[in-house]
Amino acid sequence: MNFYQDLGFLVFGSRLKRLGDTFINDVNRIYKDHEIDFDASWFPVFYILSQKKEISIKEISNDLKVSHSAISQLISSLQQKGFIKSVISKKDARHKAITFTVKGEKLLQKILPVWNALEKAMSELVEESVNSKKILKALTTIETGLHDKNLFERIDAHL
């Protein structure tokens, strides 16, 4: 008996969390084994900065659909480590923006090959099964459905 598989949707969230934790732990092991001072939890901010070069905390929060407070805490931590800095926005001098420091840019260059390898490894994993190929589309469908009507409302309707 496989506990998680047998319980189906009752443990769907637990399975996703367990899978996510496994991915994060393995990726962090890669960074550590390759002596790269990076934590997978920093990925969203680093990725967005790698694409946009300069962005406000509010824009990051909106892009990631994460609270302003959570992003501010992560930004503060990355600033203390010397990877990013706050600057006057080039778009609007009345606002501040976040950008990489030289140290952050150097770290980005070290982690880009890991991101490429990660994307290849995940693509290979998904290619191992016809069902796996549908997972990203299925996740998007679930996320959209939850945006339309959250899980609390869906459960409460059955009580």
PLM features per residue range, with description:
Residues 76-137:
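Charged, amphipathic alpha-helical coiled-coil/dimerization segments
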Residues 1-34:
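N-terminal leader segment of winged-helix/HTH proteins
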Residues 23-30, 64, 107-126, 142-149, ...:
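Alpha-helical linker/hinge and terminal dimerization helices associated
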Residues 57-58, 69, 76, 96:
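Residues within helix-turn-helix
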Residues 1-5, 128-159:
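C-terminal regulatory/oligomerization modules of transcriptional regulators
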Residues 8, 12, 41-42, 103, ...:
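N-terminal positioning helix adjacent to the helix-turn-helix/winged-helix DNA-binding module
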Residues 25-67:
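N-terminal helix-turn-helix DNA-binding core of bacterial DNA-binding proteins
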Residues 36-41, 70, 101, 125-129:
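Short helix-coil-helix linker/hinge
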